[in-house]
Structures are given as C-alpha cells and as structure tokens.
C-alpha cells in the first residue's frame, strides 16, 4: 500500500516538540534547539510535559502520551519533532487514540522513535522521517554535533524533490558491499533493537517488497548478530528487495564475554548472515546514530546498489 505523504514543510512552520522517550538533558540544550528553528522563521511549540522527569523517562507514560497525542492531533501543526531518543516510546502504544490522529504531518526522530514510526505506519500509513532528533540542533560538541552534511540533508528532506544519492560519511567514506545487484522498494527500518523487539507484537514491521534499513548504537557485535539472525528466522528478510546496514557507532569490544580470543567483526557477521540471502546489500551508510546522519523518508521509494555501493532516495517524502 502506498504511504500517505505529509505536506512539505512551509517556510513559517509550526513545529511541535515532544519527548516520548527520555527527558531533556539540560534547559540550555532545549533552548538552543528552539532558537535554531525560530531563527529560521518557524514557531516552536513545546509539549506541556516536556520537561518532566520520571526515572529515565520524560514523565510518566500518561504524561508523555498526552503530549504525543496533542502533537499528532492538534490542527495547524506542520511537524512533530522528537526531543531525543532513549527508552520508553513503545510503552505509549496502548495510550494513544490512533483514530484521533489528525491530518498528515511531518514526524521526525530516530533511535527509540523507531517505535513511533512503526505505529504510524500501521495506524496512519504516513511517510515518516528517520532523522535527527531536535537535540542535535544545538552547539554541543559531543558525539552528535550538527554537521553540515546532517543539516543540509535534513532540510532538503522536507522539500518536494527527491533527495537522490545518500552522501558518504566524510570521515569514513568506505561503503561495504555485502550482496551484489540492485533493488528498489519502499524504505522500511530503523533501530535494530526496536525492530527486533517489535516481532510478535501488533506493531511488527513488514519488509516484503521493501528495502530494509537497520542501525544501532553501543551494541556488542554478538548482540547485533543475534538480532539480525532473529529477523532472518522470523522471516523478516523474506522477499526484501535490498538491505542497508548503518555505520558501526561505538561498538563495544568485538569479543564474546569471558572469551577474549573469540571475535567476529561486523563485516564478517554480515557476510555470513546477509550474504547467503542473495539480495543487494551494503553497510557503513550514515543513516542513524553517528556524527553524520542522512534523514531518510520511511515509506518512500529507494534504490540500493550493492555493486555501486550506493543508497538512493528516488522520490520525495513530502507532497
């Protein structure tokens, strides 16, 4: 089924900022991000519970759900932008009135926000955007600065023109061929941990006829192996048109615990698990956690070419 595209982002957009997962880290971070978008002529509206904290969450489930319901349903909102990822978005599934979701609007976020992308694909059939959370739009100099590549791709993603070929990571430009050939289809995917945990729930993803994109952060290689093998055994790579693995970000020591001489690189693991599937597949593409991030329209048509080592967005994600 063809996804519904939200309208392109207007010059003077109304942007709702919510935190379905982890709480804002500091007030200054939030203020810097708001200033960034206001300086570009946009109106930024904050969820009323945005600054609340409940353990590692941005408020209770009810408080986070209230903000998310408002952002998805309130008339006049052009874009819903997640503050950050973390944990807890999937806890809101049963608290949102999906029938009350309003007109299509841009929804952007990544990492734990994979859960929201899956829910909106199921209940609203929208094209949504796996892209930087609003926390990235600060002057922070940590692992996730706002690079020119990330910034340019982000703003182009919400215009009614195809994005074209995804840029190479300027600091690690090598893209690995895992499977040869080329394939096209709607883009499906997100954070590997969230995709794997969706299996067996009403929100599990369907990648048949699609290009599957996965990425993750701070994960032991053997756990990446486990998660990808789980997808394969669950049939989630049956009938896919292509496979994309993001950049390896902050991978932990590539050894099995208590067996320091045992190791298997991510490249070797992908060759062993994905290679035999005979599908076009590439790895080390900047589509998630990492210093440079390409905003990707989930549900839009893309093309992956294993021999050319490219991922190309063939159509605009907005109308």
Model-derived segments and their meaning:
Residues 1-76:
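ATP/NTP phosphate-donor binding region
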Residues 24-29, 182-216:
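Conserved beta-alpha junction segments in alpha/beta enzyme cores
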Residues 76, 101-106, 124-126, 240-241, ...:
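A short helix->loop->beta-strand "cap" motif at the edges of active sites that frequently abuts
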Residues 79-89, 110:
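N-terminal glycine-rich "phosphate-gripper" loop used for MgATP/nucleotide binding
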Residues 98-120, 127-134:
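Short, acidic/small-residue loops that bind anionic groups at enzyme active sites
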Residues 125-193:
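Conserved anion/nucleotide-ligand pocket segment
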Residues 203-265:
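Internal helical hairpin/lid segments
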Residues 245-319:
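ATP/nucleoside-binding phosphotransfer catalytic cores, i.e., glycine-rich phosphate-binding loops
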């Amino acid at each position: 089924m063809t996804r519904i595209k939200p309208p392109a982002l207007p010059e003077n957009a109304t942007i709702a900022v919510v935190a379905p997962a982890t709480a804002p880290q500091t007030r200054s971070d939030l203020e810097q991000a708001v200033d960034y978008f206001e300086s570009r002529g946009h109106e930024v509206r904050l969820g009323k519970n945005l600054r609340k904290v409940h353990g590692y969450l941005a408020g209770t489930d009810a408080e986070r759900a209230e903000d998310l319901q408002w952002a998805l349903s309130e008339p006049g909102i052009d874009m819903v932008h997640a503050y950050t990822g973390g944990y807890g978005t999937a806890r809101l599934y049963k608290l949102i009135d999906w029938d009350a979701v309003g007109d299509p609007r841009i929804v952007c976020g990544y990492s734990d926000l994979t859960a929201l992308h899956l829910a909106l694909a199921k209940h609203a059939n929208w094209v949504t955007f796996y892209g930087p959370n609003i926390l990235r739009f600060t002057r922070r100099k940590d692992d996730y600065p706002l690079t020119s590549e990330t910034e340019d791709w982000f703003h182009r993603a919400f215009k009614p023109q195809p994005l074209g070929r995804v840029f190479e990571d300027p600091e690690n430009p090598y893209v690995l061929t895992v499977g040869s050939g080329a394939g096209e289809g709607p883009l499906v995917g997100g954070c590997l941990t969230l995709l794997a945990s969706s299996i067996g729930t009403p929100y599990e993803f369907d990648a048949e006829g699609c290009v599957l994109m996965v990425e993750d952060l701070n994960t032991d290689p053997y756990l990446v192996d486990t998660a990808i093998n789980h997808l394969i055994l669950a049939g989630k790579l049956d009938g896919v048109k292509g496979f994309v693995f993001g950049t390896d970000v902050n991978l932990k020591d590539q050894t099995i615990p208590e067996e320091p001489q045992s190791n298997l690189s991510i490249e070797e693991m992908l060759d062993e698990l994905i290679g035999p599937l005979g599908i076009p597949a590439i790895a080390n593409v900047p589509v998630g956690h990492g210093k440079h991030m390409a905003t990707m329209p989930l549900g839009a048509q893309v093309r992956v070419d294993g021999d050319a080592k490219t991922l190309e967005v063939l159509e605009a994600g907005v109308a």
